[in-house]
Amino acid sequence: MTDGDYDYLIKLLALGDSGVGKTTFLYRYTDNKFNPKFITTVGIDFREKRVVYNAQGPNGSSGKAFKVHLQLWDTAGQERFRSLTTAFFRDAMGFLLMFDLTSQQSFLNVRNWMSQLQANAYCENPDIVLIGNKADLPDQREVNERQARELADKYGIPYFETSAATGQNVEKAVETLLDLIMKRMEQCVEKTQIPDTVNGGNSGNLDGEKPPEKKCIC
């Protein structure tokens, strides 16, 4: 795809404590590489990737294929950058909420991140995927899968255990979030309201019509 040659611009925000592996996770997703030497993110950064999303048609049949430009925002986890991070919440369509499977404290802090997210996101119930990263370090694990799944079930969101080092479930987690977003947009189109930051390319909503400009009712 050339610049501007896409149907949708979707912004995703990676959230979580400093050191949980947000930067390496996003780098694995966009470049399919692992770099353990990334330094701590200062403020906010982003990576980009073009993908094709195949919408589901009636009765589970294949629908139209949409070209999607993903912007994946990488946020600093330190407290001193929290006000800067929350300023980006309202522009994001979906959230990758991450913790470190080798850090119980990063898991406990998921609740704090959820509170901030719910208070600052574009709607009360945004699309979120919970991610337990560093699944490649089982000997150092401090958070068991049952704990994490119970928390995800409490919030009604999908949960994945991932590894930026091996690539385990990295694509699957992002693809699941994108699918949630696109399905929400389809529902919002039916109400003639979608977030005005979404459409960035040549076509309009999921039916190829001109997109409305209001934010989605969630």
Swiss-Prot record:
Tissue/organ expression: Expressed primarily in testis.
E.C. numbers: 3.6.5.2
List of residues that carry N-acetylthreonine: 2
Lipid moiety-binding residues (S-geranylgeranyl cysteine): 216, 218
Keyword Disulfide bond applies: yes
One GO biological process term: positive regulation of exocytosis
Stretches with biased composition (Basic and acidic residues): 207-218
Disulfide linkage: 123-188
Region called Disordered, residue ranges: 194-218
Catalysed transformations (reactions): GTP + H2O = GDP + phosphate + H(+)
Any one GO molecular function term: GTP binding
Pfam families, per database record: Ras
Regulation: Regulated by guanine nucleotide exchange factors (GEFs) which promote the exchange of bound GDP for free GTP, GTPase activating proteins (GAPs) which increase the GTP hydrolysis activity, and GDP dissociation inhibitors which inhibit the dissociation of the nucleotide from the GTPase. Activated by GEFs such as DENND10.
Gene Ontology, cellular component aspect: apical plasma membrane; axon cytoplasm; exocytic vesicle; extracellular exosome; Golgi apparatus; Golgi stack; late endosome; melanosome
Keyword Protein biosynthesis found: no
Keywords: Acetylation, Disulfide bond, Endosome, GTP-binding, Hydrolase, Lipoprotein, Membrane, Methylation, Nucleotide-binding, Prenylation
Location of this chain's protein in the cell: Membrane; Late endosome
Membrane topology: Lipid-anchor
PTM annotation (Cysteine methyl ester): residues: 218
Subunit note: Interacts with SYTL2, SYTL4, MYRIP and MLPH. Interacts with RPH3A and RPH3A. Interacts (GDP-bound form preferentially) with DENND10.
PANTHER family assigned to the protein according to its UniProt record, in alphabetical order: LD44762P (PTHR47980)
Family: Belongs to the small GTPase superfamily. Rab family.
Function, in words: Small GTPase which cycles between active GTP-bound and inactive GDP-bound states. In its active state, binds to a variety of effector proteins to regulate homeostasis of late endocytic pathway, including endosomal positioning, maturation and secretion. Plays a role in NTRK2/TRKB axonal anterograde transport by facilitating the association of NTRK2/TRKB with KLC1. May be involved in targeting uroplakins to urothelial apical membranes.
Protein name (record): Ras-related protein Rab-27B
Organism this protein belongs to: Homo sapiens (Human)
